[in-house]
């Protein structure tokens, strides 16, 4: 019997797993933004010492995992599981990072929802007694994403006002059965939502319906409400997607009010950095969570947040064939450190 299941999509964790350590790696533009002081490793080299941007993204995950192990006082052999993914075809950023390390690995593709998805699965593995610890990790890179999903940088294509800037960064979090730190008390698994948005330069619009569907499901399943949280944090809707989410909630009689924020509007200073509609990418929510948010929770400045990773489930092939962009969102409830 699924004793921990709540409603249609959610579950609780009676013995909440603990996020004991976290690490973040940020690129040049991200290191010039308002959250720069919260990142562990900051690089001015977009290649991270490698020959290609794709190899640079692999290097970011390697740095994040290494920093996580260092902070936790652990060796690679001490990790029971790694849940990770990225935006590169076949998730080569993650698999190349972990090759020959001997760590059991489950690769994920949730697009930009991957940080929340990996955290959700880590909490299930640890909370269910299948592992003593698990690592949730992801990354993205502006240049590799532009080349894969839109146009190579050398093409010089104009960006539309609705376009977002893919974050160059990687985040890793260690989830354990005991210890001190923020605790994961419950999660909501998202459903794939498709309202027919086809513009690959307007992913906030494609993801906003999925974000609202998951947030509403969490409220319904867990018998909770916006006022029960200090923040409701979406992954990378950007400014436009955030406004659409607020409107969807208003139409349904739900006031998210001053509770809602979005990692895509936090990681950059849009007035100074000109990222159009905001940040995006797996790394957007990853470095915001593993830099700023977990630090605030651990320090007691935030008591409880609903972390909602949002993903646009497109591919180059689906875009070229004119197909719409499905969205997904997974929610993780994180309570302050003890």
Language model features with spans:
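Condensing-enzyme catalytic core mediating Claisen C-C bond formation in acyl metabolism
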Residues: 1-54, 152-216, 221-224, 255-274, ...
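Conserved beta-ketoacyl condensing-enzyme motif
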Residues: 19, 54-112, 228-243
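Short, well-ordered amphipathic alpha-helical segments that serve as non-catalytic structural scaffolds
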Residues: 57-73, 119-121, 206-221, 288-293
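Acidic, glycine-rich active-site loops and adjacent beta-strand->loop/helix elements
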Residues: 85-90, 112-113, 138-144, 190-192, ...
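Active-site-adjacent elements of ketosynthase-type condensing enzymes
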Residues: 86-102, 142-155, 241-242, 288, ...
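Active-site-proximal alpha-helical scaffold in enzymes
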Residues: 109-136, 175, 280-301
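Internal helical hairpin/lid segments
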Residues: 232-294
């Amino acid at each position: 019997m699924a004793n921990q299941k709540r409603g249609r999509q959610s579950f609780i964790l009676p013995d909440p797993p603990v996020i004991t350590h976290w690490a973040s790696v940020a690129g040049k533009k991200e290191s010039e933004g308002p959250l720069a002081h919260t990142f562990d490793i900051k690089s001015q080299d977009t290649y991270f010492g490698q020959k290609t941007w794709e190899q640079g993204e692999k290097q970011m995950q390697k740095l994040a995992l290494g920093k996580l192990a260092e902070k936790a006082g652990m060796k690679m052999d001490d990790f029971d599981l790694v849940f990770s993914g990225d935006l590169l075809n076949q998730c080569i950023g993650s698999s190349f990072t972990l090759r020959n390390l001997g760590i059991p690995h489950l690769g994920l593709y949730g697009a930009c929802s991957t940080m929340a998805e990996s955290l959700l699965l880590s909490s299930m593995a640890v909370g269910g007694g299948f592992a003593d610890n698990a690592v949730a990790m992801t990354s993205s890179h502006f240049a590799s994403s532009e080349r894969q999903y839109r146009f190579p940088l050398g093409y010089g294509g104009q960006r539309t006002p609705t376009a977002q800037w893919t974050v160059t960064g990687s985040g890793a979090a260690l989830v354990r059965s005991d210890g001190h730190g923020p605790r994961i008390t419950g999660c909501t698994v998202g459903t794939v939502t498709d309202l027919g948005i086809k513009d690959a330069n307007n992913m906030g619009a494609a993801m906003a319906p999925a974000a609202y569907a998951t947030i509403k499901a969490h409220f319904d399943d867990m018998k909770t409400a916006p006022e029960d949280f200090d923040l409701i944090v979406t992954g990378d809707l950007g400014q436009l997607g955030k406004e659409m989410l607020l409107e969807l909630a208003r139409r349904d009689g739900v006031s998210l009010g001053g509770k809602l924020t979005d990692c895509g509007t936090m990681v950059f200073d849009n007035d100074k950095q000109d990222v159009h509609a905001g940040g995006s990418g797996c790394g957007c929510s990853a470095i915001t969570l593993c830099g700023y948010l977990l630090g605030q929770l651990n320090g007691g400045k935030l008591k409880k947040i609903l972390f909602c990773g949002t993903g646009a489930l497109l591919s180059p092939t689906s875009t070229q064939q004119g197909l719409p962009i499905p969205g997904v969102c997974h929610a993780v409830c994180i309570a302050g450190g003890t």
